[in-house]
A protein has these predicted regions:
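Extracellular glycan-interaction patches encoded by glycine-rich segments
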Residues: 1-3
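Extracellular receptor-binding modules and their adjoining Ser/Thr/Gly/Asp/Asn-rich linkers
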Residues: 6-142
Length: 142
Protein backbone atom coordinates (compact mmCIF):
# COMPACT_ATOMS: atom_id res chain seq x y z
CA UNK A 1 0.00 0.00 0.00
CA UNK A 2 0.83 3.68 -0.12
CA UNK A 3 -0.81 6.96 0.86
CA UNK A 4 -2.90 6.79 -2.32
CA UNK A 5 -3.38 3.02 -2.65
CA UNK A 6 -4.75 0.71 0.04
CA UNK A 7 -4.86 -3.06 0.38
CA UNK A 8 -7.75 -4.72 2.20
CA UNK A 9 -6.00 -7.81 3.55
CA UNK A 10 -2.66 -8.58 5.10
CA UNK A 11 -1.33 -12.13 5.19
CA UNK A 12 1.55 -12.72 7.59
CA UNK A 13 2.90 -15.31 9.98
CA UNK A 14 3.90 -12.81 12.63
CA UNK A 15 4.17 -9.13 13.33
CA UNK A 16 5.73 -7.05 16.08
CA UNK A 17 5.23 -3.54 17.37
CA UNK A 18 7.29 -1.07 19.34
CA UNK A 19 4.36 -0.06 21.57
CA UNK A 20 2.06 -2.25 23.61
CA UNK A 21 -1.61 -1.31 23.28
CA UNK A 22 -4.50 -1.63 20.87
CA UNK A 23 -6.47 1.61 20.61
CA UNK A 24 -9.46 3.05 18.81
CA UNK A 25 -10.28 6.63 17.86
CA UNK A 26 -13.49 8.10 19.30
CA UNK A 27 -15.05 11.55 19.03
CA UNK A 28 -14.46 13.41 22.30
CA UNK A 29 -16.02 16.52 23.81
CA UNK A 30 -12.52 18.06 24.25
CA UNK A 31 -8.85 17.07 24.02
CA UNK A 32 -7.51 14.77 26.75
CA UNK A 33 -3.93 14.10 27.83
CA UNK A 34 -2.46 10.59 27.58
CA UNK A 35 -3.21 8.61 30.74
CA UNK A 36 -6.64 10.16 31.27
CA UNK A 37 -9.43 7.71 32.14
CA UNK A 38 -12.44 8.28 29.88
CA UNK A 39 -16.03 7.05 29.74
CA UNK A 40 -18.77 6.76 27.15
CA UNK A 41 -21.01 9.81 27.43
CA UNK A 42 -20.96 13.57 27.38
CA UNK A 43 -21.92 15.60 24.32
CA UNK A 44 -19.90 13.30 22.00
CA UNK A 45 -18.87 9.62 22.21
CA UNK A 46 -16.22 10.00 24.93
CA UNK A 47 -15.78 12.27 27.96
CA UNK A 48 -13.57 12.35 31.05
CA UNK A 49 -14.54 9.72 33.63
CA UNK A 50 -16.02 11.90 36.37
CA UNK A 51 -17.33 9.40 38.91
CA UNK A 52 -15.74 6.74 41.06
CA UNK A 53 -16.36 3.18 39.87
CA UNK A 54 -17.98 4.43 36.66
CA UNK A 55 -19.75 1.54 34.85
CA UNK A 56 -19.55 3.47 31.56
CA UNK A 57 -15.73 3.55 31.63
CA UNK A 58 -14.26 3.12 28.13
CA UNK A 59 -10.51 3.00 28.71
CA UNK A 60 -7.44 5.20 28.96
CA UNK A 61 -6.11 7.80 26.52
CA UNK A 62 -3.09 6.28 24.75
CA UNK A 63 0.08 8.16 23.84
CA UNK A 64 1.48 5.71 21.25
CA UNK A 65 -0.70 2.72 20.38
CA UNK A 66 0.87 -0.17 18.51
CA UNK A 67 -2.31 -0.58 16.49
CA UNK A 68 -4.89 2.16 15.92
CA UNK A 69 -8.42 1.41 14.72
CA UNK A 70 -10.92 3.89 13.26
CA UNK A 71 -8.10 6.29 12.36
CA UNK A 72 -10.15 7.77 9.52
CA UNK A 73 -12.54 9.46 11.96
CA UNK A 74 -12.71 13.20 11.42
CA UNK A 75 -13.79 15.23 14.44
CA UNK A 76 -12.89 18.45 16.22
CA UNK A 77 -11.57 16.42 19.17
CA UNK A 78 -10.26 12.88 18.64
CA UNK A 79 -9.63 10.62 21.63
CA UNK A 80 -7.24 7.69 21.11
CA UNK A 81 -8.54 5.20 23.68
CA UNK A 82 -6.49 2.13 24.67
CA UNK A 83 -8.84 -0.84 24.64
CA UNK A 84 -6.34 -3.52 25.64
CA UNK A 85 -2.64 -3.78 26.39
CA UNK A 86 -0.13 -1.78 28.43
CA UNK A 87 -0.71 1.95 28.87
CA UNK A 88 0.43 4.68 31.24
CA UNK A 89 -2.48 5.79 33.42
CA UNK A 90 -3.16 8.65 35.84
CA UNK A 91 -3.78 7.19 39.30
CA UNK A 92 -4.64 8.38 42.75
CA UNK A 93 -3.94 6.68 46.08
CA UNK A 94 -1.91 3.60 46.93
CA UNK A 95 -1.70 0.87 44.28
CA UNK A 96 -0.27 -2.63 44.60
CA UNK A 97 1.02 -4.47 41.54
CA UNK A 98 -1.79 -6.71 40.26
CA UNK A 99 -4.57 -4.61 41.81
CA UNK A 100 -7.76 -4.19 39.81
CA UNK A 101 -8.10 -0.58 38.67
CA UNK A 102 -11.37 1.37 38.46
CA UNK A 103 -12.17 4.99 37.69
CA UNK A 104 -11.57 7.38 40.58
CA UNK A 105 -13.17 10.43 38.98
CA UNK A 106 -11.42 13.46 37.48
CA UNK A 107 -9.85 11.24 34.77
CA UNK A 108 -7.88 9.13 37.26
CA UNK A 109 -7.91 5.45 38.18
CA UNK A 110 -7.56 3.87 41.62
CA UNK A 111 -7.08 0.39 43.03
CA UNK A 112 -10.15 -1.53 44.19
CA UNK A 113 -10.23 -4.76 46.19
CA UNK A 114 -13.85 -5.54 45.30
CA UNK A 115 -14.91 -3.67 42.16
CA UNK A 116 -18.46 -3.86 40.85
CA UNK A 117 -19.03 -5.76 37.62
CA UNK A 118 -18.30 -3.65 34.54
CA UNK A 119 -16.15 -1.06 36.33
CA UNK A 120 -12.66 -2.58 35.99
CA UNK A 121 -10.31 -0.78 33.60
CA UNK A 122 -7.43 -3.22 34.00
CA UNK A 123 -4.70 -4.36 36.42
CA UNK A 124 -1.72 -2.46 37.79
CA UNK A 125 1.72 -3.49 36.56
CA UNK A 126 3.57 -1.62 39.29
CA UNK A 127 3.28 -0.40 42.86
CA UNK A 128 2.52 3.23 43.67
CA UNK A 129 2.50 4.85 47.10
CA UNK A 130 1.98 8.51 46.29
CA UNK A 131 -1.07 10.74 46.27
CA UNK A 132 -1.36 10.99 42.48
CA UNK A 133 0.86 10.06 39.56
CA UNK A 134 1.29 7.90 36.48
CA UNK A 135 1.77 4.12 36.44
CA UNK A 136 1.59 1.45 33.78
CA UNK A 137 -1.47 -0.79 33.80
CA UNK A 138 -2.75 -3.57 31.56
CA UNK A 139 -6.04 -2.33 30.13
CA UNK A 140 -8.72 -4.91 29.46
CA UNK A 141 -11.91 -6.23 30.91
CA UNK A 142 -11.01 -8.54 33.77
Amino acid sequence: GSTSSYFNQIFAQATTALYADLAEVYEADTDYAPGTVVSFGGSKEITVSATEGDPTVAGVISANPSYLMNNGLTADHRAIVALTGRVHTSVTGAVTKGAMMISAGHGHARASAAPAMGTVIGKALENFDGESGIIEIVVGRM
